[in-house]
UniProtKB/Swiss-Prot annotation:
It comes from Streptococcus agalactiae serotype V (strain ATCC BAA-611 / 2603 V/R). It comes from the Bacteria. GO terms for cellular component: cytoplasm. It is found in: Cytoplasm. This is UPF0298 protein SAG1583.
Length: 81
């Protein structure tokens, strides 16, 4: 059984009432009602197509992809670089 590679994205909304419309695009991990954004996890191979589709929805203000793949996660010896 292989582990499914997933990537997170932050979706900023104009209104919180539209948050439930995004449940079909991926797994909603967190919904901040005060700051009006959601954190959604999507399969890594589908992230480009899903983010383009979500950006074109009229109730979405902004979509930001997670940068966890770009960050060097080898923390041993980072103080001396």
């Amino acid at each position: 059984m292989n582990k499914q590679e997933r990537l997170g994205m932050s979706v900023y909304l104009y209104y919180n009432r539209d948050a439930r419309k995004l449940y079909k695009y991926g797994d909603v991990h967190y919904h901040s009602r005060r700051l009006r954004y959601l954190v959604i996890y999507v399969n890594k191979e589908d992230i480009v197509s899903v983010s383009k589709e979500i950006k074109h929805l009229k109730f979405v203000k902004d979509v930001r992809l997670s940068a966890i793949d770009d960050i060097d996660q080898d923390f041993v010896g980072n103080l001396y670089r």
